[in-house]
Amino acid sequence: MHHALRLAHELLEDARLLLAQGRYRSTVSRAYYAAYHSCVALLESYGLRPSNYTGRSGRPASRWEQGIVTAVVVTDSNLSGVLTRPIALQLRWQYAQRIRSDYRAHETISAMTAQTSVELADQIIANVEGYLRAQHP
């Protein structure tokens, strides 16, 4: 199993535990990163590397950046067989919720937002895993 996918599973389990404890901010953050890391595994399965993209510095990226991952997942037509556009767009929604959760202390994160974040991460991971299994039976 790809190292990023292993991490995605660990983070999703953390998100579920946090959700059960009513810790909605942390749930949203962990769920986003679970989805994010599964997308990294998907991109790398296509042979893509961070250096294929321009990073925030204006030079080839030295690591996967959130802006790169969320943009590529939504715009790369090769990935549409794995993550449909509506699912891919949900990664952007999750990112926005993670920013709210981590940096906007005055905003409340609802149980529904946290639950939805976990469900979306689970769906993205399942799609990526299904694709990777089909490619490497």
Description of each model-found segment:
Residues 1-137:
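Terminal alpha-helical segments
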